[in-house]
Amino acid sequence: MAITRRSFLKGVATTSAASVIGPSLLASASANAVETTGTWKVSGSHWGAFRAHIYAGKVQEIKPIELDQNPTEMLNGIKGIIYSPSRVRYPMVRLDWLKKHKYSADTRGNNRFVRVTWDEALDLFYRELERVQKEYGPWALHAGQTGWNQTGSFNNCTAHMQRAVGMHGNYITKVGDYSTGAGQTILPYVLGSTEVYAQGTSWSEILENADNIILWANDPVKNLQVGWNCETHESYAYLAQLKEKVAKGEINVISVDPVKNKTQRYLENDHLYVNPMTDVPFMLAIAHVLYTENLYDKKFIETYCLGFEEFINYVQGKTKDKVEKTPEWAAPICGVKADKIREFARMLVKGRTQILMGWCIQRQEHGEQPYWAAAVVAAMIGQIGLPGGGISYGHHYSSIGVPSTGFAGPGGFPRNLDAGMKPKWDNNDFNGYSRTIPVARWIDCLLEPGKEINYNGGKVKLPDFKMMVISGCNPWHHHQDRNRMKQAFQKLQTVVTIDFAWTATCRFSDIVLPACTQWERNDIDVYGSYSSRGLIAMHRLVDPLFQSKPDFQIMKELTERFGRSEEYSRGMSEMDWIRSLYNDCKKSNEGKFEMPEFDEFWEKSVLDFGQGQPWVRHADFRQDPEINPLGTPSGFIEITSRKIGRYGYEHCQEHPMWFEKSERSHGGPGSDKHPFWLQSCHPDKRLHSQMCESEEFRATYAVKGREPVYINPLDAKAKGIKEGDLVRVFNDRGQLLAGAVLTDSYPRGVIRIEEGAWYGPLNEKVGAIDTYGDPNTLTQDIGSSELAQATSANTCIVDFEKFTGKVPPVTSFGGPIEVA
């Protein structure tokens, strides 16, 4: 619909001009307006819903929709994604792979590629699928990598790829994810569900009833800018109310964190420093105080919990380690004075206390333990299931805590084969290997094929796969230890990547296919990941750029090569699918939510169902644990898990325990050589690695063209480093360059480089310096424990120095080196 700029601005006049997460987008976007007429289209993203001004076939301007009262500044980066110099423009094949085929792995990563036609690229892709299934079998193909993808119900790129590849033959896949691998594995044993992705107690209930809120390694102001679906940013209104209550002294908020994070600075609440990776000793000492001073809720423990006696015997030093977990024992480990530990423990039981855990704390060696120990502390407080009390593991994620309307969102494109379908290569012989592996252990498969590892009560035999198909995700961002990955990728015969951006994953691939962005195709999506506020039409803004195509079209053309395209698509077009998903959604919500016919919805673009009713997590369990049991083996909170105990694991035993790390700062193992803890948390200006390629937006935070490294001024002074200097950060695993930002928000001995920075090695050789600042160049690739085998990225210590050599160019961006 073509409209004038004046009528559009009249339509958005109700949008808030202020945001707790940054300056208003309305002010900054209007300054960039270049035309007075044009077409305005609604679309969405992980960063929120917006209207885009289209003129002369290009996106000129982006504004948040009226419903978003707290838009993120990251909407300003969307144009930079669409028009990034790092777009995958054409089908590309790695030069040496094309010349020598699978025998060229030693040059993988040199970024030298040849442009080919779509037919040539898809023929090569299909040929490799055929070869691998014929020569080896399904165990030799890994097509299970996943990530955040882009938003949209129909255009889930992983679903499209896995359905198409699955129609050809079976393959290796994964279980778990990088975000919450340890947490989602341990918590079902303790609280009966993964908890990390569960709707939590409504913010309104917390604000009305809580006396104390503990933000434990939790930074919602930073992390709620993005959502799994199209985000509404409704949580920020509650955070603004919380700020007012903190200022008035109505709620006591304490951030337990090694750093003063963005939320703490916004709320201006108290900060309790804890040494990195030592939260468990702190929690054990809290439990000791609550028990020895008889402050814990004995009735709650007896009514709702099992296994308290075994745990408290450990805390009292009555088990095999013979160490009493007193505040005096914990203080030199965690860096909190014994008297402060006692004061904090006593505060927890004065009034209603809501503990809000973050995810960063479980992405470490023994990452299961802090989540388990925190649940035990919450149980001892005795307020689980009460408004404003208990524990949550998700209030920083995708608007968890905003009441859900109950609207059932649309389904998606089917990932699996339809009933009765069989793949072309109907072979289920995985040669004795496991067909499903823990997500963070896939590099182990390449370096130690055939090795048997423990995992969550079972055994996994690591498959010796030869080929990978990667769609819409960037494992060269989210996995750890880049130089180990380089060694592992030399074992692969073929890597096919389908993406719209030339990431490091493309650099280390053999065949790269150009997908279009989500703004070059149509879709629909839930508006509000957990609030389910409504439904949004995601209109195609511009035609696919260069030779890029929607994933649906790419995979349809692949399946044509073995006669399965009609089965793959069910004979439906993109808009047929979107209409069908909408109509199915309308039917499933009949009698609950009024939805117009599809054409009216598509023109209207946004359906708003308002807000849901407040809710309290675990309230039904507290009301009657026998009628409403938890999903644990006993139905109760399991402080001690006999099931885990029977596994006989060394690093995850039957109740929460303190395990020393393989490396730790502040006096821990290895700190004499590498004394600084590297925190690689979720970024403030990206969604993981998404938007790093957006040049103008990246320039708002990069330092001399590099990723920032945040350093305490005293640590910087000791090394002769000033604001803006280039810094070499290093350990025995790798080295990188980053730009120094000096700030008192970080204590001595702690530095931060946010994850998602694009890896840009100087060359393909093992040990080459990363020119931009990817922290996973330095992190270690070990499992959290035998239970979850999850990522341990935050068990990482480093050293740093001012860089004085010849400054290399950044190699992360701009696409491949095209060879004629």
Curated annotation (Swiss-Prot):
Cofactor(s) needed for function: Mo-bis(molybdopterin guanine dinucleotide)
Enzyme class: oxidoreductase
GO biological process: anaerobic respiration
Signal peptide span: 1-33
UniProt catalytic activity: trimethylamine + 2 Fe(III)-[cytochrome c] + H2O = trimethylamine N-oxide + 2 Fe(II)-[cytochrome c] + 3 H(+)
Record's keyword terms, sorted: Metal-binding, Molybdenum, Oxidoreductase, Periplasm, Signal
Keyword Transmembrane carried by entry: no
Keyword Metal-binding found: yes
InterPro entries, sorted: Asp_de-COase-like_dom_sf (IPR009010), CT_DMSOR/BSOR/TMAOR (IPR041954), Molybdopterin_N (IPR041460), MoPterin_dinucl-bd_dom (IPR006657), Mopterin_OxRdtase (IPR006656), Mopterin_OxRdtase_prok_CS (IPR006655), Prok_Mopterin_Oxidored (IPR050612), TAT_signal (IPR006311)
Positions with a binding annotation for Mo-bis(molybdopterin guanine dinucleotide): S179
Compartmental location: Periplasm
A cellular component annotation (GO) from this entry: outer membrane-bounded periplasmic space
Record-listed E.C. numbers: 1.7.2.3
GO molecular function: electron transfer activity; molybdenum ion binding; molybdopterin cofactor binding; trimethylamine-N-oxide reductase (cytochrome c) activity
Pfam families (UniProt xref): Molybdopterin (PF00384), Molybdopterin_N (PF18364), Molydop_binding (PF01568)
Cofactor details (free text): Binds 1 molybdenum-bis(molybdopterin guanine dinucleotide) (Mo-bis-MGD) cofactor per subunit.
Job of this protein: Reduces trimethylamine-N-oxide (TMAO) into trimethylamine; an anaerobic reaction coupled to energy-yielding reactions.
PANTHER family: TRIMETHYLAMINE-N-OXIDE REDUCTASE, TRIMETHYLAMINE-N-OXIDE REDUCTASE 1
Family the entry assigns: Belongs to the prokaryotic molybdopterin-containing oxidoreductase family.
Protein name: Trimethylamine-N-oxide reductase
Record organism: Vibrio vulnificus (strain CMCP6)
Lineage: Bacteria, Pseudomonadati, Pseudomonadota, Gammaproteobacteria, Vibrionales
